[in-house]
Regions:
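Active-site-proximal beta-strand elements of phosphoester/diester hydrolases
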Residues: 2-8, 73-80, 120-125
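Short strand-coil-strand connectors
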Residues: 70-71, 117, 158
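Active-site environment of divalent metal-dependent phosphoester hydrolases
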Residues: 10-15, 36-41, 55-60, 82-87, ...
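Conserved beta-sheet core of the metallophosphoesterase superfamily
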Residues: 49, 85-150
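Helix-adjacent hinge/juxtasegments
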Residues: 51-54, 60-103
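A short, polar/proline- and glycine-enriched secondary-structure boundary/capping micro-motif
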Residues: 15-16, 85-89, 133, 161-169
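Core catalytic region of metal-dependent phosphoesterases/phosphodiesterases
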Residues: 2-70
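Charged phosphate-binding loop/patch that engages nucleotide di/tri-phosphates or the phosphate backbone
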Residues: 147-173
Length: 173
């Protein structure tokens, strides 16, 4: 199973279209972690399972998404309602409550990934307004490949190229 995660494009339609066009057919699902600032009816949003972010005023997206793909339970939130700037504990509790195998979030504009008690926690970073150590990449998103043994996480830059230093493999055991 392969899932693509993107977040915080803040109205940048072009980058979402490029990502969708490039990876359509290569991934099983595309998840958007919020702050798209685009209407759900916008054609560019159609490939993405999207949640509402703190700057998505008046847009009709859910607060959470739970997608089941090839027996993997993928939970997506924006993060602002779960204090992800300070701790992952509320998100971890929500992930366990939903029996998620992957919990993805945005909001911080900084990529992050870790595996805790068999659950992968992933922030794809902001595709349009990155912050922190990897800001120089101009934006990031991630593709997670999952099999029975491991989570394989590859981050990509804004030019849709894999970032060699941002490839992580986590055992599911």
């Amino acid at each position: 199973m392969k899932a693509l995660f993107v977040s915080d494009n803040h109205g940048d339609r072009d980058i979402l279209q490029k990502i969708a066009d490039r990876f359509k057919g290569e991934v099983n699902v595309m998840m958007h972690c919020g702050d798209s600032n685009l209407e759900p009816s916008d054609p560019v949003m159609q490939p993405f399972n999207t949640v509402i972010g703190n700057t998505d005023w008046g847009l009709n997206y859910p607060k959470t998404q739970l997608a089941v793909v090839d027996h993997e339970r993928i939970l997506v939130v924006h993060g602002h309602l779960y204090q992800v700037n300070f701790t992952l504990t509320p998100l971890m509790l929500l992930a366990k409550e939903n029996r998620a195998t992957i919990a993805a979030y945005g909001h911080t504009h900084q990529l992050a990934v870790e595996c805790n008690q068999g659950i992968l926690y992933l922030n794809p970073g902001s595709i349009s307004q990155p912050r922190g150590q990897y800001q120089k990449l101009g934006g990031t998103f991630a593709i997670v490949s999952v099999d029975a043994d491991q989570f394989d996480v590859q981050y990509y830059d804004r030019s849709l190229q894999p970032v060699d230093d941002l490839h992580f493999v986590f055992s599911r055991q």
